[in-house]
Amino acid sequence: MRIFYSVDVHGAETVWRKWISAIAMYECDCLMLCGDLAGKALVPLIDFGKGYYKSGYYGREVKLKTEEEMLDWEQKLANGGVYSCRINKKELEDLQKHPEKVDEIMKQEVVKRMNKWLDLLCEKIDTSKILSIVMPGNDDPIELDTAIKGHADRGIVYPTDKVVDLGGHELISLEYVTPTPWDTPRETSEEGIKKMLEEKVSWLKNVPNSIWNIHCPPRDTDIDLAPQLSKELKVQAGAEGVKMVHVGSQGVRDMIEKYQPLMGLHGHIHESSGFTFIGKTLCVNPGSEYGEGQLRGFVIELNPTEIVRYWKVQG
């Protein structure tokens, strides 16, 4: 079996389309997109009643006079992982008074895009022949899970609640991470991580031959390094450049050391693309450059008893 494994797309439509295209490019039997599927920003297109809409993102302000211009702007935002909505001045004032309504619109757009993406995946890929695994991550609202599970009858696999057969290997999956500065929807303590993993390990029949799809990477490795942040959540830099610190999970590491599965598939830390070994266990993190439209991934070849080869790709 040949797997294409990628993570942390964060709503970027360009990256999603590239992920689907990878099946032909790398002649894979399995597609895995695991962790942090949703974007992080919502940009309004505002009708002030003057014959045009105004919008802006990252310091750029635009006036949109035609439907074609609005669709083009919305697509540019989507390609970069940003959601959009069309509102008038009165609706803008209401949203400013009621921030919780912005959250609701955001969740609606997240689910809408996820459904669109999964529909596209099912159109482009024969899911009866290509194993297609899609897993949320810590940044993703719970509502997103419904969209993935809603495509089960079309062959999309939601993996966190079951053991998945991966070319003769048992796959278990965990989307939770240890606490972050941003208080994301799926966080738990180190003990919580270990408890969740212990339960999933109990489902396995052959632990040494299993593969663990855990969004959070193991601590103190080459795949858990992120920029050090100040109390104001600003990146810390010195004379030698950005300071990097280990931010992975000790609980994940402890469990890998204890059980020594065949392989760990990880993500979460965008800057730490690479691989490492914990004992006999190979652990990989493709990293992410979704904002630049870059697809990062690992191609992994398996036979029923071992990893044949693996390599990192980007494009």
State what each model feature region is.
Residues V15-L166:
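Core catalytic region of metal-dependent phosphoesterases/phosphodiesterases
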Residues H169-S210, V245-H246, Q250:
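Binuclear metal-dependent hydrolase catalytic cores centered on His/Asp/Glu-rich metal-binding motifs
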Residues E13-K18, Y26, P44, E199, ...:
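Catalytic phosphate/metal-binding cores of nucleic-acid and nucleotide-processing enzymes, i.e., regions
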